[in-house]
Structure formats: C-alpha cells, structure tokens
Amino acid sequence: MPTPASEILAKAILPTGLSSADIRETVPAEIRRRSFFSARTAEAEYLEEARRVCAEAASGRIGSSKARELLARSLRRWGYKDAYGAPGAIDDLGSEERLNLIIDTQRDMAHSVALIDSQTDANLDAFPAWRLERMGRRRDPRNWAERWAQAAAAVNWEGVARNGEMVALKGSPIWEALGAGVQDYRDTLGNPYPPFAFNSGMDWTSVDRDECEALGLVPGEAKRGKRPDLGPLPADVKRALERLGPDYKRKLEEWAHFGEGVE
C-alpha cells in the first residue's frame, strides 16, 4: 500500500526557473501533481535532495527542524545566495518560511493521497463524506467558508451539504473545484485534496454515514461517495501532453525528464 514517503519519491523532478504564478499558468495540473518542483528552482540535484528529505519528513523519520537543516545544507553546497528575494522572504529559497512551505506542502499532499489510496468500499460506505476544517492556526486566515460556497455553487451543490457546514461526499466535484481555485484564486495547488492552497492550514476529516444522512447527503445507495480518481499516472500525463501538442512537450523536456512511460 502506498505511503506518504513513497508518494513523494514517485514524483518526477521538475527543475524550473518559473515563478509560482507562471508554473500554475503553464504546467497542467496533471503534470504538477506528478512532479516535485519549487518555484524558481532550476537545480535538479537540489530538488532530488529535497525530494528525499521531504519523504523522510513525511515518514516521520526526521522532524521539520532536521529537514530544514538538511535542505539549508544542500543549498549551501549548491552555492545559493538569495538570488530571488530579500534574505528571509518567501522568495529566498533558504529562508525558514520557504523551507517550511516546501516541507509542509509536500508532506500534507502526500498524506492526503495516501489516505485516499487507503479507502476501501467498506470505509466509503461507513464514512461517505469529508469535512473541511481548520487544523492549523494562521495570523491572517483566508475565508474558506466563502471559497466553499463559491465552489459549491460552481458544481451546483452536487454532493454538498446545504446547512452551511463544509461537508461533501468524497466523490463530490467540489473537491476538484476547491483545488482548481474557482473565482480565480491564485494560491491553489490544483489538487482535489488538502492542502487545497499554499499554507492554508485546512485539512479534512471523515464524516460517518449517520451524519451524512442527517445532512441529506446519502438518501440512497446510488448517492454514496465514490473513490476519487487522483492519478497521477503516466496515462494522465500522456493525455495532458497530447492535449497541449508537441511544442509544449518539447518545452517540458527542457525543464525536466518526464519521459518514463510517456510516448
């Protein structure tokens, strides 16, 4: 069974000098989901080391402090000197804020994918929905209730509770909409699972069948939540590349080696 560490190690390295906004605009979600990258980080060897360190952190073998130490050491070996931002800022690859962002985002994404991969039919029957809730305190928390309502409206409230709680069936399209950033949110990651946006502090917990029925989400067996199709598989990447055409594939090959299993 996949683990958070194995989910991270399975990702392809994607060196790029692009900013976060440019990555979001240029690289399809199917490819981002299958790749290990960081904005304005074109050094493949550093990314390989970061992937390994993040996998160690996701497995619990090392803590965040040790992970930051190892990544900072790798940056020094590479010769990094605050190339893209003031020291200590998020654009500074060696800042504590930036290193925490990389470690936490990779760990949280991997845990979500491993959790979904572990879902069985029996589990989905007993716990058909997720509840989105705050798990981490933030100095300036974003308005997730507003985002939820906008995403729910975008999918016509399909499989979504209508009582104001952020609860939806595990197979509801709202999770895809949240990750895609409906209403043009620019901080989202393009994934149908937490963390839906960078440094959001939001996560989900399972909701049992009795509560779902009380919310009107499971009136019959036909509306039981289905297992989401997360990918990311070579076939997903192949479809994305075919959709974008040969020019994009050549550009992608300049950024990273994505050839395995994709022709």
Give names to the regions the model predicted:
Residues 1-199, 205-263:
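Domain-core detector
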